[in-house]
Amino acid sequence: MTGETEMHVKITENKDRAGYYTIAPFGTIDSDTYLDFNEQIAPILAPTTKGIILDLENVDYISSAGLGVLFTMKKFLKEKGSQLLFCNLKPQIKRLFEIVNALPKETLFKDAEEADAYLYKMMNQEIEKQGEGPKSPQ
């Protein structure tokens, strides 16, 4: 049976900034796990979500079904003016994204700290546009 295998996904919200999350799946995102993965991330795909870092350090394989979930998530966030950033990609995952020309290079980061720093920068630029002072990282 496809789409019915459970997948472990760790989701954490940034305690200093509401609406910013890190999602860290474990294993593979494929035809056996994509439905469970999608179900687990669905609660944070809300209009109040400002940014998501998808940490793929523990993902060894992503199938077309898994890519579909990621593209849907990216599209939803983009429509809401939010961002989806990727970090800790294993070489085969990075190559997959390059082959399908799926992600702009500015959304791929070496690690979560680098992605988080980028989100801080983008958040401060938005705050400055609205006439407020910049926030400092916690």
Residue ranges of predicted features:
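Short acidic-hydrophobic, aromatic-tinged amphipathic segments that line or gate anion-handling sites
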Residues: 107-111
